[in-house]
């Protein structure tokens, strides 16, 4: 078999694929100047996962996924990659890929949520094993460094920077719009110049800065600087509030359920259930953030698997409950368009004459959900940078700890600027899909990492073991690649461009400063 790396200088090849041993990773994490405080238990870790997974989507996306949709993409760039490939194979052209249609799942969207939870659990199990085995901040970046080598570690680290930053820019802009709308309902109208993105949908809006989007990031930054214990405590409160809002909806909405609305249960059969699952899959993204907290966990071998798996289970139960109640309150076709599609839960409660106080609770739950998402992803972003800096792939500034709070204070401020300023300037629109492709790519490498470590280090103690290796990790890889193929072509192009920028930085800076550079 020819050596495909034969044209790569031997020294560079050795460095690109050099793996950092788990023992070395753990030893580096114990350095007095770079040691994070350990204060997170299983409840806080589970709350981190719930905080990241459940945003406002539980109140918004369920109705659209149940009702289905039909639309035409404006260009081939906005067509799904899988549709482009299938149309070319079947018809010899690409034009058919512009027509998108997702059949209605109907009340069976609850089954879609269950199937997606099972699919996500394959990746979740892989994260649980590696997080219990390698209790280091860095998540998929650290796991890749231990299994696939420095080059892949850099690629996934750079990918995670994109995932967390772009996702939070989108959430911050969404929060600002929601916040402005709620103030307006009370007669308080914010100036558009200071509460609207400067750039939206390809043109200047005339605004100066989206101040609410920036301020929510700034205030969360102050909280994160205080320490992980304080941040986790605040997240626990917010998670409790949004779960309470969901439970109140389940009780109030449950009294308004008419079983006749559940018929037909699956109007489009299994196809509708599967396509509905493709829509709601991304409501489960976020459980991987728990793994960035491994280094600050008191008992990571036991608690990391609990946090990851428990957060998935809790969120799945809440999603299924909301789906069944919402689609029992009104026929699924009601949520196909208009205000019912934009805010199905609020629409259903208002249409059925529920007291405004309950609507206010839903609003509080949605806004709290967005803030907790912002908090958790800002936290995770900083821990990724911290780990990359400690490995000398980023400047030392990113791993500097505050002498009093023991938090990566410079990284936290840089993350504030990297997310807060773009959130004040741009409405990134469908570029938010970069979060989805970045997450799925991380899932693929983590799943592969489990297989690699089972072969290279089978005797190392594991607090949790994925069953049926390599079958379960391979199922995770196939599912994630399939979902990636369902994303838009423009998303793939943006992703490749971002990785290209990252490779330029790696070969121009990081590779020369890595601890493997001199070896």
What are the residue ranges of the model-derived segments?
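Membrane-interface "cap" regions at the ends of multi-pass membrane proteins
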Residues: 2-106, 121, 125, 136-137, ...
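Helix-loop-helix junctions that connect adjacent transmembrane segments
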Residues: 20-37, 70, 77, 81, ...
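Membrane-helix boundary/coupling elements in multi-pass transport proteins
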Residues: 59-62, 122, 136, 159-177, ...
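Extracellular loop-to-transmembrane helix junctions
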Residues: 60-201, 311-314, 495-499, 503
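TM-loop-TM module centered on a large, flexible mid-protein loop between adjacent transmembrane helices
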Residues: 72-105, 142-143, 149, 180-192, ...
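Hydrophobic alpha-helical segments of multi-pass membrane transport proteins
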Residues: 181, 246-249, 385, 435-462, ...
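C-terminal membrane-solvent junction of multi-pass transporters and transport-like membrane proteins
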Residues: 205-208, 220, 267, 397-409, ...
């Amino acid at each position: 078999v020819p050596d495909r790396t034969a044209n790569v200088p031997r020294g560079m090849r050795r460095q690109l694929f050099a793996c950092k041993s788990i023992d070395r990773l753990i030893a580096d994490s114990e350095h007095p100047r770079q040691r994070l405080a350990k204060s997170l238990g299983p409840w806080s870790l589970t709350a981190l996962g719930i905080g990241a997974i459940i945003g406002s989507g539980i109140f918004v996306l369920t109705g659209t996924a149940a009702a289905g949709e039909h639309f035409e993409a404006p260009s081939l760039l906005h067509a799904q990659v899988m549709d482009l490939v299938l149309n070319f194979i079947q018809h010899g052209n690409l034009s058919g890929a512009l027509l998108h249609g997702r059949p209605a799942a109907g009340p069976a969207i609850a089954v879609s949520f269950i199937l997606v939870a099972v699919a996500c659990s394959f990746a979740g199990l892989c994260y649980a094993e590696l997080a219990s085995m390698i209790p280091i901040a860095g998540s998929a970046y650290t796991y890749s460094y231990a299994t696939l080598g420095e080059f892949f570690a850099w690629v996934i680290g750079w990918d995670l920077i994109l995932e967390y930053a772009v996702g939070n820019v989108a959430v911050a802009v969404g929060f600002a719009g929601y916040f402005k709308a709620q103030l307006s309902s009370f007669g308080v109208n914010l100036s558009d110049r200071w509460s609207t993105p400067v750039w939206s949908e390809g043109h200047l809006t005339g605004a100066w800065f989206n101040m609410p989007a920036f301020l929510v990031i700034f205030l969360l930054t102050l909280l994160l600087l205080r320490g992980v214990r304080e941040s986790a405590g605040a997240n626990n409160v917010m998670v409790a509030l949004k779960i309470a809002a969901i439970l109140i909806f389940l009780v109030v909405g449950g009294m308004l359920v008419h079983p006749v609305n559940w018929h037909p249960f699956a109007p489009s059969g299994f196809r509708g259930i599967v396509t509905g699952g493709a829509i709601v899959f991304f409501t489960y993204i976020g459980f991987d953030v728990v793994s960035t907290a491994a280094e600050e966990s008191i008992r990571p071998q036991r608690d990391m698997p609990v946090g990851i798996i428990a957060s998935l289970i809790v969120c799945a139960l809440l999603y299924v409950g909301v789906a069944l109640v919402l689609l029992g309150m009104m026929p699924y076709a009601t949520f196909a368009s208009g205000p019912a599609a934009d805010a199905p839960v609020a629409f259903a409660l208002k249409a059925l004459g529920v007291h405004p106080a309950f609507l206010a609770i839903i609003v509080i739950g949605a806004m709290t959900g967005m803030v907790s998402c912002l908090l958790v992803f800002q936290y995770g972003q900083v821990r990724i940078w911290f780990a990359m800096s400690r490995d000398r792939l980023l400047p030392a500034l990113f791993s500097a700890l505050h002498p009093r709070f023991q938090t990566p204070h410079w990284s936290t401020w840089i993350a504030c600027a990297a997310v807060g300023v773009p959130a004040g300037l741009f409405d990134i629109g469908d570029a938010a899909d970069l979060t989805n492709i970045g997450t799925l790519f991380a899932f693929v490498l983590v799943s592969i990492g489990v297989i690699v470590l089972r072969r290279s280090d089978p005797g190392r103690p594991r607090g949790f073991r994925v069953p049926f290796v390599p079958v379960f990790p391979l199922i995770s890889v196939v599912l994630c690649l399939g979902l990636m193929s369902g994303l838009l072509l423009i998303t793939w192009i943006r992703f490749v461009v971002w990785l290209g920028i990252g490779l330029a930085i790696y070969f121009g800076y990081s590779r020369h400063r890595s601890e493997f550079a001199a070896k």
